[in-house]
């Protein structure tokens, strides 16, 4: 018994009806999920188009190419409409998200309190700016040092009486925490040939009993210049220019002093608010120090100066106790 033969016109009408129904459903789909369900319903393996195509075997052989062409045309049409509707829905979804996440720029912002530069750091920056303007290069070195760089290379051997002038933090491995930034000068001179002009800022450590003017950890800045023909007059001119930039037009005096790594040496005072304040030590680099780094003291001379940053900051900001710098008291820090 043979299968009944379908009429070509009947199957063609089914394809036309499917197209009209599918296009209407696609055009009214409101979500991407709904659109995907329509794709499966019409074009899936068990979809309506597949069910119609399954009937093609009952058509006369001569009608099958015609129905096949109509079916392929319908499939391409539906795929195009599905993709176009998908693009539209995606654009609408993005637009809705942007609208929901939009910011009203007229609304008041959330206040974020501003921080302040610590008075020690602002003082360091100000001092470095002055010396960089005078042609000096900023140099840095390690805070953990060897006895050689901290003492011996600076003309302070183990049996030198000046060792008793500083109480030092020694570490278990035999190294120490530097007591001054002069060690940076030695390291720099070992690496570079004259002429050199450097300014070396950094933390230093000494076994001082803490009080209003002393701290075990403090900041120091030192300068060093080495060249042919430098004299004490050049040192005085540099120091005077620096102090005038920092404090303004104030009286300055130099007093003879002693440091193991400079000869001659001097202390420098400024007259501030009616009294003399000691602000730094300085001097001509001892020839022995130049020899230690391989410089010929018959050809080169140099000068150096060093001072504590805390002392300068206390004078500039009229702070009465060095310990205020390290308490992290916002009532104090907000003043700067």
Curated annotation (Swiss-Prot):
CDD domains: PheRS_alpha_core. Its EC number is 6.1.1.20. It is found in: Cytoplasm. Keywords: Aminoacyl-tRNA synthetase, ATP-binding, Cytoplasm, Ligase, Magnesium, Metal-binding, Nucleotide-binding, Protein biosynthesis. Mg(2+) binds at residue 263. It catalyses: tRNA(Phe) + L-phenylalanine + ATP = L-phenylalanyl-tRNA(Phe) + AMP + diphosphate + H(+). Tetramer of two alpha and two beta subunits. HAMAP family: Phe_tRNA_synth_alpha1 (MF_00281). Belongs to the class-II aminoacyl-tRNA synthetase family. Phe-tRNA synthetase alpha subunit type 1 subfamily. This is Phenylalanine--tRNA ligase alpha subunit. The lineage of its organism: Bacteria, Bacillati, Cyanobacteriota, Cyanophyceae, Acaryochloridales.
């Amino acid at each position: 018994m043979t299968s009944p033969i379908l009429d070509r016109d009947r199957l063609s009408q089914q394809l036309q009806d499917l197209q009209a129904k599918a296009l209407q459903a696609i055009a009214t789909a409101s979500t991407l999920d709904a659109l995907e369900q329509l794709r499966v319903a019409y074009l899936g393996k068990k979809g309506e188009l597949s069910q119609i195509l399954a009937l093609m075997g009952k058509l006369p052989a001569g009608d099958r190419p015609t129905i096949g062409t109509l079916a392929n045309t319908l499939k391409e049409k539906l795929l195009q409409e599905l993709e176009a509707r998908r693009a539209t829905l995606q654009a609408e979804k993005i637009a809705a998200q942007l609208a929901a996440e939009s910011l009203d720029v007229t609304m008041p912002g959330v206040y974020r309190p501003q921080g302040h530069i610590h008075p020690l750091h602002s003082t360091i920056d100000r001092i470095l700016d002055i010396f960089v303007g005078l042609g000096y290069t900023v140099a840095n070195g390690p805070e953990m040092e060897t006895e050689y760089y901290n003492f011996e290379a600076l003309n302070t051997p183990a049996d030198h009486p000046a060792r008793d002038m500083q109480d030092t933090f020694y570490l278990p491995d035999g190294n120490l925490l530097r007591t001054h930034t002069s060690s940076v000068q030695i390291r720099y001179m070992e690496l570079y040939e004259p002429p050199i002009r450097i300014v070396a800022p950094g933390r230093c450590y000494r076994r001082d009993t803490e009080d209003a003017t002393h701290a075990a950890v403090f900041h120091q800045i030192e300068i060093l210049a080495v060249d042919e023909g430098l004299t004490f007059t050049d040192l005085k001119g540099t120091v005077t220019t620096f102090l005038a930039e920092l404090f303004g037009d104030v009286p300055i005096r130099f007093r003879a002093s002693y440091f193991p790594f400079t000869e001659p040496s001097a202390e420098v005072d400024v007259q501030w608010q009616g009294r003399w304040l000691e602000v730094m030590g300085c001097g001509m680099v001892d020839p022995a120090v130049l020899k230690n780094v391989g410089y010929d003291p018959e050809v080169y001379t140099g000068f150096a100066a060093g001072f504590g940053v805390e002392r300068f900051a206390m004078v500039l900001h009229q702070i009465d106790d060095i310990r205020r710098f390290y308490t992290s008291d916002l009532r104090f820090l907000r003043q700067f």
